[in-house]
Amino acid sequence: MAFTRQALAVYEKADKNWKENMATKGAYVVQDAANPDITILASGSEVNMALKAASLANGKSIRVVSVPDLAKFASLCPCEQEKIIGNPKRVVCTEAGISTEWLQFAKKEDCFCIDRFGTSGPANKVAEYLGFTAEKLAEILNK
């Protein structure tokens, strides 16, 4: 396994208690929407992609949630999860990994994940090769 640091943009968090919520709930709201049409659950660098995809979605009200600890978030009672997810019409999940664990929150067609072995190379080139881009995620959001 090879690890590398990515040059990721730092984003403003809508949740002012994000550090506490990340530690105690495993997730926090990055971009809020009062009555979201869609909530995107994302982890790691996919949060940046989710924010870009949300900006490309046509007329949709979108909440973006960072889920750095999926196991902790999944262990919360449904009422606590709903406080973070909101009450959207759809939940879309994205991760540069398999979708299995995300299926408890979204339908298979709403999991924008990589359910196959990848390839090696610069992160942006590999993502483009695999079709794992903000533009492709925006297509799912616009369905």
Label every model-predicted segment:
Residues A2-K143:
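Thiamine diphosphate
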